[in-house]
C-alpha cells in the first residue's frame, strides 16, 4: 500500500500525498517506512516557519504570502498546526478558512495538523509531514503555529527562515517574545500596523534588536522589522522579499547547509532518545526490571546506577548515563 501511495505521490496525486501525511502523523511504524522510502527525494523545499501569539493575523498574512509565491510559479505547501479543544476534540480553525481559497489551486497543498494533546510528538509529526510535502515537489513549505510556547519553538526550529508575527497593543509583547522566540526569529512582522501603538511596537522591537548588535554583526544578518496590514495587502511584497533575501544570505554564507546539518543532528538525537525511552517503558510495563526497581526502593543502588543497568540490558552496553 505504501509503495503504491508513494508512486502516486511522485506523479502529483494530492490524495495519495494527504494519505501519506495522515500515516506519518498517526502510525509510528508506517511513518518510519514512509520516511525511509521518500528520504532520497527530500531536501529541495525551502521551509518558512510563521509563528506568533493568537490574534496576530498569521493566517491572513500567510494567505497573502501564498499568492506572492504562486505569482513566481512556485509550488507551495502549508502545514497549519491547530490547537485542539480538550472539550470538543475539534480543531479551532478560525480565519484559516481564508486560506482554503487556494485549495482548488493544484500548485498549493494545505494541511492542518491538530495537537490532540500529544504535544511531545507534534514536532516529530510536523517534521515528517514536511518531508512528505518536500518529496511531493513543493518549492516552499510554510509551517504556521499558534502561540509562542516551547512546542512552537520546537516546531519552528524545523524551518530555514523563522517569521515572528506580532501586533500592536499586546501589552508586554516584546518581553514575551524575548522569553520565547526572540532568539530564533529571522524576520519580525508587526501586522495590523494601522492600529494605534504600531509605532511604539516598532520602536521597542528595534531597540531590543539593537541591544544585540554584536550578535548580528557576527552572524551577518540583523533581523528586519516589517510592518504589514495583511487585510489590505500592505507590506506583503516587502515581507516576501525579506524572506527571499534571508534565503540568499543563508545560501551565500554557507549557513543554510550548516543549519540543516544541525537540524539533522537534533532529529537523530530525538529519534534515538524516543526509541530508548519506548523500549525502557515497554520493559518496565512487562515487569522486566522489578528487581532493579526494588533495589533502588531499598536504597541498595541509586537511580543513576539503575538507569545504567537498564540501558546496558536494553542496548547491550556502550551507553552510560553515569557522570564521567
From Swiss-Prot:
Top-level division of the source organism's lineage: Archaea
Q: Which residues bind GTP?
A: 52-60, 194, 229-231
Q: Which UniProt keywords apply?
A: ATP-binding, Chaperone, GTP-binding, Hydrolase, Nucleotide-binding
Coiled-coil segments:
none
Query: Which molecular function terms from Gene Ontology are attached?
Result: ATP binding; ATP hydrolysis activity; GTP binding; GTPase activity
The EC number(s) given in the record are 3.6.-.-
The record's annotation in InterPro entries points to: AAA+_ATPase (IPR003593), GTPase/Isobutyryl-CoA_mutase (IPR052040), GTPase_ArgK (IPR005129), P-loop_NTPase (IPR027417)
Instruction: Please name one Pfam family that this protein belongs to.
Output: MeaB
Q: Would you identify the family this protein belongs to, as annotated?
A: Belongs to the SIMIBI class G3E GTPase family. ArgK/MeaB subfamily.
Q: What does this protein do?
A: May have GTPase activity. May also bind and hydrolyze ATP. May function as chaperone.
What's the protein here called? Putative GTPase PYRAB02490
Origin species, per record, is Pyrococcus abyssi (strain GE5 / Orsay)
